[in-house]
């Protein structure tokens, strides 16, 4: 397996798809990277030469990926929580942050249902 940005990318897939295994690189970014490196998108990773892999690695270094990106995202969330913004409060409470209705659904963010005991009549 070839390593790019500390991640083993699959050898059997096309390069443009394999690059998306790196956190922070989607399909469009992968296409831009390959264009910069001068590598055809349809080439399989196993068919790449060491020189082409080197050019791809250099192009990826220009982007913030993997650990650095994860760290930045977590620091951004911590900052929102510390300043007490609405988004920070939603993060702290584990509720949807982007304005979704949470009266009935939002189970992905809220977790499994917690039943509340009925008071006697």
UniProtKB/Swiss-Prot annotation:
Biased composition (Basic residues): 106-121
Disordered, as annotated region: 92-121
A GO term from the CC aspect: small ribosomal subunit
BP terms from Gene Ontology: translation
Record's keyword annotation contains Cell cycle: no
SUPFAM superfamilies reported in the protein's UniProt record: S13-like H2TH domain (SSF46946)
Keywords assigned: Ribonucleoprotein, Ribosomal protein, RNA-binding, rRNA-binding, tRNA-binding
Function: Located at the top of the head of the 30S subunit, it contacts several helices of the 16S rRNA. In the 70S ribosome it contacts the 23S rRNA (bridge B1a) and protein L5 of the 50S subunit (bridge B1b), connecting the 2 subunits; these bridges are implicated in subunit movement. Contacts the tRNAs in the A and P-sites.
Subunit organization: Part of the 30S ribosomal subunit. Forms a loose heterodimer with protein S19. Forms two bridges to the 50S subunit in the 70S ribosome.
Protein name stated in the entry: Small ribosomal subunit protein uS13
